[in-house]
Amino acid sequence: MSNTIFMMMAAGGVAEQPIDGQTGVWLKSGDVTLSRGMKMTGAVVSSGRKQFVYSKGEARYTQCLGVGDVLVSNGGVASNCCISGLSNKGRLLVYAGGTAVSCVLQSGEIHVNGYPSAATLVDAVAHGGPVRFQNYANVSNFTISGGTLNAGEGGGPKRIYGMNVCGGVANIYGNTVLSGAAVHAGGVLNVSSGGRAVNAVAPEAGIITARSGGIISGGSAGGAGYYVAYSGGVLSGIALSSGGSAFGYGGGVSGATVGSGARLRLTSSGSFANDIAVERAGYLYVSAGCGASAIVVASNANLLVFSGGTALAVTSNAGANVTVSSGGYIEYA
């Protein structure tokens, strides 16, 4: 049997149309299954229909309009799909063994759930709608510019290799590791509850937060970008450059470098910092109920310890500016 497929389309009559890669086909009257090397190009899925792609089947340039699903699994590939479902009802669903490449979400949903084996999403862009990365999701070069990403549902590991957060909110948790992320103006990256982000940067005005159980290691913030360590969250090995900031709201900061024009502020009780290098024209603030230790303050760098704050094992180089308010405490190394 040829891999050219004929679809039945009916609305009061019957019409046959070859899916030949040249003409778009509307999937209104029935679902379609692509497998065993079958290929479909330019289909439009709507009205509750479904396009199933598996076992070496391939769907290219599918548009999912209105209420419709594109389901990819077990060796199937979907590429260059556009999901723009009415009232957020269109969906791209990538299951175990499935791969979706260069797909765009205008509205609707993307779910990637690979249990019991990997499901793969590559070079996808989400402008809106909810996105979920669940068990065994394997994602690379993902961009979110609107809507919400939740990466962490299910007990299996989730891996994201490269992400741009240009808007919207990305939540990383539940045994999910994010390697390499850039958070831009209007974007928020939250890491919590077993999630980890490695080398997440906020070069402009993005926001990166470590919440309870979340770890952020490596990365940098400049411009108006900033990090926040909430209670139970940890920032490790970050670098702050001019205009960049980090805030301790009950969480911890370790191994950080505070560069010229940058600020590290321990503001809420319970915040702590360890192994901090404050470079020329950088600032470290230690407020009431907060503590810092193993601090190196360079020439023309600034350490301010307020009433109720504590700084231990401080190395103050010649020309450093160290200010301890009444009720503050400092010990030099």
PLM feature spans:
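The right-handed parallel beta-helix/beta-solenoid scaffold, focusing on the short coil/turn
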Residues: N3-M7, G13-E16, T23-V32, R36-A43, ...
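Residues that line or immediately flank small-molecule/substrate-binding pockets and catalytic motifs
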Residues: G85
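Short, intrinsically disordered, charge-balanced linker/junction segments flanking boundaries
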Residues: Y329-A333
